[in-house]
Amino acid sequence: MPFVIAYPVIDPVLLSIGPLPIRWYALAYIAGLVIGWAYARHLVARASFWGGRVRPDLGVIDDLLVYTALGVILGGRLGYVVFYNPAFYLSHPLDVFKLWQGGMSFHGGLVGAGVGVMLLARRRGLPTLALGDIVSAVAPIGLFLGRIANFIKPELWGRPTDVPWAMVFPGAGDLPRHPSQLYEAAAEGALLFLLLFVAVRLGALKRSGLVTGLFAIGYGCARILCEFFREPDPQLGFLFGGATMGMLLSLPLIAAGLALVAFAYRREAVPA
């Protein structure tokens, strides 16, 4: 039997306040929103990051938190229903509302967040890409913490393997598997640092849509790479030629990112 690392079983409940359990899973998402909100406020407060480009004020960032959070929840759930398990939810339509049972799609959440951004931009009379660039710059914070939460739960584990760091996950049978949640956390964490470096050090926020495009390309490539190690959803399996739904949904994301980067560089950076 190959050497495996013992899975560090962690109580999913951090603490209980009376009858209310506080779960690591929920805490990770809340922390992602709060830290992302704080970093977004930092971005818009620094005029030098934006040059002469129109940027939202701090009040807009507070609204942006609400709009994107709702968009991620609604879009993530609907994306999972449509892309990953439509047959089940057609037979059990009321289960669509049972969010506590799990089942969220990043790509659906991304679409939902995009809709939220567009609605807020229209309401406040701001350029959509100004808000989109902010969301893209902070999104990897939540993605990193979310993948750590997937590992703690545990869920979304990897494929069977004999690598020295393989783990046997509770509920995933007796085979050692890739800790693919940690791979995704690392990739999305690295993406965060890349975006921070590009946005803050190289002035990417001065080019409308550049940060959004870089995020789309970076996340799409990281997701496709990590899908080679992640166990596909059991109700879908492999679609064709070893491809998974996560891979296919990431391809248009990369294409959109490339288009945005090209758009950003066809326009002059806005000087201070």
UniProtKB/Swiss-Prot annotation:
Pathway: Protein modification; lipoprotein biosynthesis (diacylglyceryl transfer). Pfam families: LGT. It is a multi-pass membrane protein. One of its GO terms (biological process) is lipoprotein biosynthetic process. Keywords: Cell inner membrane, Cell membrane, Membrane, Transferase, Transmembrane, Transmembrane helix. Belongs to the Lgt family. GO terms for molecular function: phosphatidylglycerol-prolipoprotein diacylglyceryl transferase activity. Its EC number is 2.5.1.145. It is found in: Cell inner membrane. This is Phosphatidylglycerol--prolipoprotein diacylglyceryl transferase. NCBIfam families: lgt. Its main location: membrane. It comes from the Bacteria. GO terms for cellular component: plasma membrane. The chain crosses the membrane at residues 24-44, 64-84, 99-119, 125-145, 185-205, 209-229, 245-265. It comes from Methylocella silvestris (strain DSM 15510 / CIP 108128 / LMG 27833 / NCIMB 13906 / BL2). A 1,2-diacyl-sn-glycero-3-phospho-(1'-sn-glycerol) binds at R147. Catalyzes the transfer of the diacylglyceryl group from phosphatidylglycerol to the sulfhydryl group of the N-terminal cysteine of a prolipoprotein, the first step in the formation of mature lipoproteins. Signal peptide: none annotated.
